[in-house]
Amino acid sequence: VSLQDFHGNYRYNFLDEHYRKFFAQVPVIIQWDDHEVKNNWSPAEHAELADPARQAFRDYWPVRGGRSQHLYRKLSFGPLIDVFVLDLRDYRAPNSDNDQAEAGPETLLLGPEQVAWLKKAMGESKAVWKIVGGEMPLATYTPQWGLDSWANGKAEVLGREHELADILSFIKTREIENVVWLSADVHYAMAIEYLPEKAIFKDFKPFWEFIAGPLHAGTFSPQDDLDPTFGPVEHFCA
């Protein structure tokens, strides 16, 4: 697969008139996920595809900081909002059963450098709202397609959830207020409230997550219940 092939994928989407109008009129913060390279990819398994895919992504979606800049970043919008854009692809371990009892190299999703950056940036933020944009939902999981995100469907902190639990505990310890998560990846929209009193892991502040559906892919309903580890309560799904 060549760079030209990846360019062609982007051009194909822009053949749609409504898609073009949307991006001409609406400011958008862009981040990549799996389908910019290959379904549910990881660097260890698909390194040969990642380089041309990353170049094509940057060709069509310029990112502040230039091509040498990593894709995770913070964007500030006055005193009200800081947006923390995460990269859940470049630093992850390959997919597994995601049920490791302890954190380790095989449970990485963000990786230690990005986690340290996120903690520092959120701890220093003076914005009223802290929006965390993290491509993949926190409590949804798709065992039929591989356990590609944080969750695994089991009622305890396992696998990649160790990393998420650490971040949520940090937010509580530092008393960081008004944190909202935005995610996508799945082919439906959902609003989820996370409540410690309903959770297995309870060392976090209540927060909301909003999941957006796709612009140019089919939609379908969730096929599994939400992972109960962090006490998710579904308020909307479409």
Which residues does each predicted region cover?
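Metal-dependent phosphoester/phosphodiester hydrolase catalytic core
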Residues: V1-A238
